[in-house]
Amino acid sequence: MGLSGISPLSLLLILAIIVALFGTSKLKTIGSDLGEAIKNFRKAMNSEETNDTQKDDHKPL
């Protein structure tokens, strides 16, 4: 058994259907866009944490 009761053969069949529907070039574009979105999200989260710690440093005790 694979993930959540899905067999590896079923996963390969689903992957083949997705490739047939979208084509490899479209999947590559989607993958690149998704990776860039995740990278930008992480960058925004890290900069927000940095800004929060800088604001906390200047609070009076």
From Swiss-Prot:
GO terms for molecular function: protein transmembrane transporter activity. The keyword Ion transport does not apply. The keyword Acetylation does not apply. The chain crosses the membrane at residues 2-22. GO terms for biological process: protein transport by the Tat complex. It is found in: Cell inner membrane. GO terms for cellular component: TAT protein transport complex. Pfam families: TatA_B_E. Keywords: Cell inner membrane, Cell membrane, Membrane, Protein transport, Translocation, Transmembrane, Transmembrane helix, Transport. It comes from the Bacteria. It is a single-pass membrane protein. InterPro entries: TatA/B/E (IPR003369), TatA/E (IPR006312). Belongs to the TatA/E family. Part of the twin-arginine translocation (Tat) system that transports large folded proteins containing a characteristic twin-arginine motif in their signal peptide across membranes. TatA could form the protein-conducting channel of the Tat system. The Tat system comprises two distinct complexes: a TatABC complex, containing multiple copies of TatA, TatB and TatC subunits, and a separate TatA complex, containing only TatA subunits. Substrates initially bind to the TatABC complex, which probably triggers association of the separate TatA complex to form the active translocon. This is Sec-independent protein translocase protein TatA. It comes from Legionella pneumophila (strain Corby). The gene is tatA.
